[in-house]
Amino acid sequence: MAVHLPSYADYMVASEELEPSLGWSYDGWLGDLAANPEMKSADIAVSMVDRYMEACLSNNPNDYLSLSVIDLSVVPTLLRQVETYSAYLTEALENGQLPTISRARQRMYPFGKFADSSTDMVDFMAFLDATRQFAPNMASQIESTYRTAIHYSLGTDMFDYLTGMSILVPGSNVSEFITSFDEQYDCGEKYPNYSQFTYGY
């Protein structure tokens, strides 16, 4: 989603994990804004994350929670780098590395799994660390850019990886994914190389 927003906003506030039924604490961050109408957009976004976590933890301290602030000005650079990286991953698939990548994917936590509602979204760094062997220098560049893009991030200690942004990596139901991707989610014009990798995988 973040790749579609840089023309429209400075920051994106989003959760990697499913959000609880409690939802966002609007009175919290709106109260902060009312008390300080001169707040910068980045500070408003951080307040959203803080107030969300406070409200959700108060409701259930053992919940699966995450919320991040993404600096959208960095996302176009990140996208270009991921596109280059994806070409290396497709080459790895063509060279017989499907079993390696598939095993790595099965070890990743798909967000929503705790509620049996997985959407094949995994943590960005979990994906990068699992595949960096195929293009280590490019992976290091991506990691540096990614760390810059994550302006702020909070979450509970329920995850092996929770670094601020998720990425779609199809799991066991690849054929089902391809059908739904074609019909509903294909935005390949934004990231053709990554789309090619997911189809090939």
Question: What do the PLM-derived regions correspond to, one by one?
Answer:
Residues M1-Y201:
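Terminal, contiguous helix-loop blocks that mediate binding/assembly
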